[in-house]
Amino acid sequence: MVKIFDADLIKGHIIVTDNGKRTLIDTGCPVDINENNMQRIPGLRQHLEGARGFVDPTLDGFWGLEYFARHKVLFDYRKKAVMVADQGDDIMVVHPIAEYPLLRSIVNPRLIIPMKIAGVERKMVFDSGACIANYITESIATTGTEAGSVFDEHPDPDIGRYEVKLFNLPVEIGGETVEIPFGVQPADIDRDVQMSGAVGVIGVGLYKNFQVLVDCPNRRLVLGRY
């Protein structure tokens, strides 16, 4: 079965209504956040409350990697739409230009893809929740061209709201080079990313510029032109 959801974009976050539940789509979240999981997994309710505080007070839950493991999910940010297919059904971006294997994370459950950034192939976490800024290790980011700054926010109250200085870096996608801005994450988050075997996180830099198909059943991520 294939379903198409209208998406609300709130502070860049992608939110759909699924069976009457307001659901934030976050590939950076290792599990789904719903009533069942909140009763058995410590910390999930606090994570949801944090997201209600800085994204949308009407949120009921998250689609995390549990959901993606069972489905193929296509993001069309410009049309404010999300298409979802069961494992046995096919969906595809309209004009595919690049396909990446989804690599295994060393420690934490993550969607990791190899991308050529600043002339070097690097492992990056695809995180649909990275909707304000993309991030990369400071030693790489600062080789780019300064591109202003933005404010981002994290549901952990110990991190909260913080300023992010941005640097444009060249990223090769489908035989073309695209300038994408990257910032530097707070040290604790950057350390967690590196423990996964990656050097950074990319989200908004992809789905604002391309349709994105996350096909976990077939271990691939496909980009398509708008």
For each of these PLM feature ranges, what is it?
Residues 1-226:
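Pepsin/retropepsin-fold aspartyl endopeptidases
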